């Protein structure tokens, strides 16, 4: 018989930097999960990644207080900032540009992020990522 799922916890945790302080501690503590066990397992799985990379994680809590977690790829905004070399997006998106990004870089991001996106083709994924880039104040060049 399968374990009974009691809930899901969605968090965005920096790679290699999971610790019991907020937001991880309270989110897992509410479900009665072992916080340190998650932190150790997460840090072990993200040890080879660049430290500080934001990693979305979905934690599945079970009735016997055990858990499993699934890591996803970093958010599109992280890839866009890294590709364009900016620290943050434009404060006045649509009027001022914070940086530039090429269609080739957008295609590369779309191919990398494809498993996490809900689109059928790379072209559809590119359209979604271009929208995110415009929202961040990035100029899209040929």
Swiss-Prot record:
GO biological process, one term: translation
InterPro entries: Ribosomal_uL11, Ribosomal_uL11_bac-typ, Ribosomal_uL11_C, Ribosomal_uL11_C_sf, Ribosomal_uL11_N, Ribosomal_uL11_N_sf
One Gene Ontology term, aspect cellular component: cytosolic large ribosomal subunit
Keywords for this protein: Methylation, Ribonucleoprotein, Ribosomal protein, RNA-binding, rRNA-binding
GO molecular function, one term: structural constituent of ribosome
This protein's record includes keyword Lipid metabolism: no
NCBIfam families per UniProt: L11_bact
Subunit-structure text: Part of the ribosomal stalk of the 50S ribosomal subunit. Interacts with L10 and the large rRNA to form the base of the stalk. L10 forms an elongated spine to which L12 dimers bind in a sequential fashion forming a multimeric L10(L12)X complex.
Entry-linked HAMAP family: Ribosomal_uL11 (MF_00736)
Name assigned to this protein: Large ribosomal subunit protein uL11
Gene from which the chain derives: rplK
């Amino acid at each position: 018989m399968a374990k009974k799922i009691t809930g899901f916890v969605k968090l965005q945790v920096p790679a290699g930097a999971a610790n019991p302080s907020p937001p991880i501690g309270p989110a897992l503590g509410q479900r009665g999960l072992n916080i340190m066990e998650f932190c150790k397992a997460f840090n072990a799985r993200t040890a080879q990644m660049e430290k500080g990379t934001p990693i979305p994680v979905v934690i599945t809590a079970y009735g016997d207080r055990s858990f499993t977690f699934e890591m996803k790829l970093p958010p599109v905004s992280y890839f866009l900032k890294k590709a364009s070399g900016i620290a943050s997006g434009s404060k006045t998106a649509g009027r001022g540009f914070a940086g530039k990004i090429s269609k080739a870089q957008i295609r590369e991001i779309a191919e990398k992020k494809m498993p996490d996106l809900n689109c059928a083709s790379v072209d559809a994924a590119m359209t979604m990522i271009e929208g995110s880039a415009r929202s961040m104040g990035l100029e899209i060049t040929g």
